[in-house]
Regions:
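Hydrophobic positions on the alpha1 helix immediately C-terminal to the Walker A/P-loop
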Residues: 257
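Conserved internal helical-beta-strand scaffold that buttresses enzyme catalytic cores
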Residues: 2-252, 262-588
Length: 588
């Protein structure tokens, strides 16, 4: 039964059904009754396992195929008509050739299965920020996960009306054949196709595929920005809430910052933090010339291992009801879940992420390192009152960060917008090669968008520079590094809630309330301007954390030039002059 008369939608659904040949088609209306019926059906096939209703009400466990447990960058393509529009950081294939290849794989891929039609919205339905999509899938796990991660159902179809302005998404698990696994974006056709995967990041098409890869291209064409950023509201003791966005590569503490709990000395004074978003921000220029942000998602798709009462109590609290856990440990004694880093008490009677009997003493991991929770944002104790706002929140600061042992100081402010774009473009994290003890590879991840930018990274930087010209009141741009180490390799900064001490200085800079010292890199705090009360950090350590090693930075400049070289004439001239200016300052 079609839920819409929109021919742009019904015709496409019919075409895709003729290709995939499902046994039946079910339109998702967004009602709890229909979702409950689907969850019940998935329990019958083992696709979902119901967990302890008393301890984890409305929660389920899902296990993906062992060969299908993460995003696959090597199988992810941007198929723009011209290869140069995809750029050197994306995989590209000619769209015609790719469609042909994909249609061959989709042909009959849903035989004997049901095709579900999911109308979904990124952003609050009916808001200026909202963009709509339809995902076709043969997976109930995808349906119930999309119902958490996005706003779904009949209201979305009503908002689309008879327009052709929506993103088409086709997903089929097919055979789960890793050799024929593709996650493909056709930016000019507003189309996403994902096949032979059942894993979240590849199949919840609203997330990275739409909200970043396709949306970044839409933003370029429509004068807005889709960014891989958290959105955090910081409420000071006067009751004023100020907002920051933050871009961090994976394993750099993004979720912890998004759900930050102020240190005790701050809590006592009345500081509070509010989560607007933990992963994606859509940013538009407001009538006041400021940048306004919304979180287009409706849930959190978080990494489970390491999430604990100590590391991130807010994230853990968000998973206590109506959550889907993927590839974690199942405790057979009380039918709950566990993962490494949750606590020190792994269950004795349990199944690992593959569903095999697990012995917690044999050294094997019970949960997959990339195991996940899909939880409604509304469950989070610190979810912002502005979460459902149609206009979003005004952004005072953009914070970039990476994981560097020695180069980047704890915090510095860029000199201006273009310099800030430069700071974001050189973002990097380094891996430690444990065997040799040497600091290993520096992985550049500009604006944390390397895997998610839907077009040429050089054009993306140009778009940032162009946006700066259109903002009469732009946010100030900062870089942080929570991961500086001493000569023994120990972290010098406590991180977690104590990061608020740095964010306080950042916001003070945005509102002209605190001074700074100019260095070769930009503006840094005076040691006395960071509140260390109760942090356990001495002023000497802080001074060390703020030091700029000119020799290291001159080496860094070489690495940046090598990185920039691959973009050829797509590198904005503003960034070329920023690297020249930085080298000049360092040589003085």
């Amino acid at each position: 039964m079609n839920l819409t008369n929109n021919v742009h939608i019904t015709k496409w659904v019919e075409e895709m059904a003729a290709l995939c040949k499902p046994e039946s088609i079910v339109w998702i209306d967004g009602s709890e009754e229909q979702l409950e019926q689907l969850r019940h059906e998935a329990m019958g096939t083992g696709e979902l396992i119901k967990l302890n209703e008393e301890k984890l009400p409305g929660c389920y466990l899902h296990r993906s195929d062992p060969n299908d447990v993460a995003r696959v960058e090597g199988r992810t393509f941007i198929c723009s008509r011209r290869q140069e529009d995809a750029g050197p950081t994306n995989n590209w294939m000619d769209p015609k050739e790719m469609y042909e290849k994909l249609y061959g794989i989709y042909d009959g891929s849903m035989k004997g299965r049901t095709m579900y039609v999911i109308p979904y919205s990124m952003g609050v339905v009916g808001s200026d920020f909202a963009k709509y999509g339809i995902e076709l899938t043969d997976s109930i796990d995808v349906v119930v996960s999309m119902a958490i991660m996005t706003r779904i159902g009949k209201t979305v179809l009503d908002a689309i009306g008879d327009s052709a302005d929506y993103i088409k998404g086709l997903h089929s698990k097919a055979e789960l054949d890793p050799e024929k696994r593709y996650i493909v974006h056709f930016p000019e056709d507003n189309t996403i196709m994902s096949v032979n995967s059942g894993y979240g990041g590849n199949v919840l098409l609203g997330k990275k595929c739409f909200a970043l890869r396709i949306a970044s291209t839409l933003g370029r064409d429509e004068d807005w920005m889709a960014e891989h950023m958290l959105i955090l509201g910081v409420e000071n003791p006067q009751g004023e809430v100020r907002y920051v966005c933050g871009a961090f590569p994976s394993a750099c503490g993004k979720t912890n910052l998004a759900m930050l709990i102020p240190p005790e000395v701050y809590r006592e004074k009345g500081w509070k933090c509010w989560t607007v978003g933990d992963d994606i921000a859509w940013l538009r220029i407001g009538p006041d010339g400021r940048l306004w942000a919304v979180n287009p998602e409706n849930g959190f798709f978080g990494v489970a291992p390491g999430t604990s009462e100590k590391s991130n109590p807010n994230a853990l609290a968000a998973t206590k009801k109506n959550t889907i856990f993927t590839n974690v440990v199942r405790n057979l004694d009380d039918n709950t879940v566990w993962w490494e880093g949750m606590d020190k008490n792994p269950p004795k009677n349990a199944e690992n992420w593959k569903g095999e009997k697990w012995d917690c003493t044999d050294g094997s991991k019970g949960a997959h390192p990339n195991s996940r929770f899909t939880a409604p944002a509304i469950n989070c104790p610190c979810i912002s009152p502005e979460f459902e706002s149609k206009t979003g929140v005004p952004i005072s600061a953009i914070i970039f960060g990476g994981r560097r042992a020695k180069t980047a100081p704890l915090v510095y402010q860029s000199r201006n917008w273009d310099h800030g774009v430069f700071v974001g473009s050189i973002m990097a994290s380094e891996t430690t090669a444990a065997a040799t003890g040497k600091v290993g590879v520096v992985r550049r991840d500009p604006m944390a968008m390397r895997p998610f930018c839907g077009y040429n990274m050089g054009d993306y930087w140009q778009h940032w520079i162009d946006m700066g010209k259109k903002l009469s009141n732009p946010p100030k741009i900062f870089n942080v590094n929570w991961f500086r180490t001493d000569d023994e390799g120990n972290f010098e900064w406590p991180g977690f809630g104590d990061n608020l001490r740095v964010v306080e200085w950042i916001l003070g800079r945005c509102f002209g309330e605190v001074g700074a010292v100019e260095t070769e890199l930009g503006y840094e705090p005076k040691a006395e301007d960071i509140n260390l009360d109760g942090s356990g950090v001495s002023e000497e350590t802080l001074e060390d954390l703020l030091k700029v090693d000119k020799g290291l930075w001159l080496d860094e400049c070489k690495g940046i030039r090598e990185y920039y070289a691959q973009f050829g004439d797509k590198l904005p001239k503003e960034l070329a002059s920023e690297i020249d200016a930085l080298e000049e300052r360092l040589k003085k």
